[in-house]
Swiss-Prot record:
Pfam families membership: CoaE (PF01121)
Group of enzyme by EC: transferase
One annotated GO biological process: coenzyme A biosynthetic process
Ranges where the DPCK domain occurs: 22-223
Entry binding sites for ATP: C30, S31, G32, K33, N34, T35
EC number assigned by the record: 2.7.1.24
Gene this chain is encoded by: coaE
Covalent S-S links between cysteines: none
MF terms in GO: ATP binding; dephospho-CoA kinase activity
UniProt-annotated location(s): Cytoplasm
Name of this protein: Dephospho-CoA kinase
Signal peptide region: none
Pathway: Cofactor biosynthesis; coenzyme A biosynthesis; CoA from (R)-pantothenate: step 5/5
Source organism per UniProt: Treponema denticola (strain ATCC 35405 / DSM 14222 / CIP 103919 / JCM 8153 / KCTC 15104)
Length: 223
């Protein structure tokens, strides 16, 4: 934490900032965002996992989500229910197969997720105003947070490496993984067109190399 605070203090006066210091973390599936988040958390950042927030919101609003998509699932012969509630793999297959269904899902769930994340940002800021807050959010470009981030760390990795990681982690057919990846082809261009200060960090096999690159980038910016 001392390294983060000293860097921040070198950039501005010792007075506590008047608003949260937000830094975005994004990138395509299985590029290494969670590893990057852990590295920066160890360095002293407060890290918010938007996926974890999303999963919690999904569970809390399963009934509404089921009502929204049950009819479309039945048309496609997809059973959304299992003994635990909504079958998340079946649900992902449904929404990622149709752009309009994905938009419908995001229109419902993203505002709720944003509200929950803002609550956590406010708590973290109240505890330690000078501490940078890292927002690990794959779809950061679809939220209002992007305009409030000082800069964005965009983690990328070779396609084949991401494919291997996804297959090992999710145990889905390659066709399903390919479909999900295809929906993310324009991720980086979204940040470019939003004029966001985006830093691409390449993540290959070595976590040590990723750590070196990440710390080099944040130190350049005084953290």
């Amino acid at each position: 934490m001392d390294s983060v605070l000293n860097g921040r203090q070198s950039r501005q006066s010792l007075d506590a900032p008047s608003e949260p210091i937000l830094i975005g973390l994004s990138g395509p599936s299985c590029s290494g965002k969670n590893t990057a988040s852990t590295i920066l958390q160890d360095y002293g950042f407060y890290c918010i996992d938007a996926d974890a927030v999303s999963r919690k919101v999904f569970t809390e609003h399963e009934k509404e989500i089921l009502n929204l998509f049950q009819a479309e699932a039945e048309k496609r012969g997809i059973n959304l229910k299992n003994e635990n509630g909504i079958d998340k793999k079946a649900f992902a297959l449904l929404v990622f197969s149709d752009e309009e269904l994905l938009k419908k899902h995001e229109a419902f769930i993203l505002p709720i997720i944003e509200e929950k994340i803002w609550e956590e940002i406010k708590r973290a800021f109240t505890e330690k105003p000078e501490r940078p807050i890292l927002l690990n959010a794959p779809t950061l470009h679809k939220t209002s947070f992007i305009k409030k981030c000082l800069f964005i760390l965009y983690i990328d990795a070779p396609f084949i490496l991401r494919l291997i990681r996804a297959k090992k982690r999710d145990r889905l057919p390659l066709k399903n993984i390919w479909l999900r990846f295809s929906k993310q082809k324009k991720f980086f261009s979204q940040y470019f067109f939003l004029n966001a200060d985006t830093i691409v960090v390449k993540n290959f096999w070595s976590s040590a190399s990723l750590k070196r690159k990440l710390l080099q980038e944040v130190k350049k910016r005084g953290f």
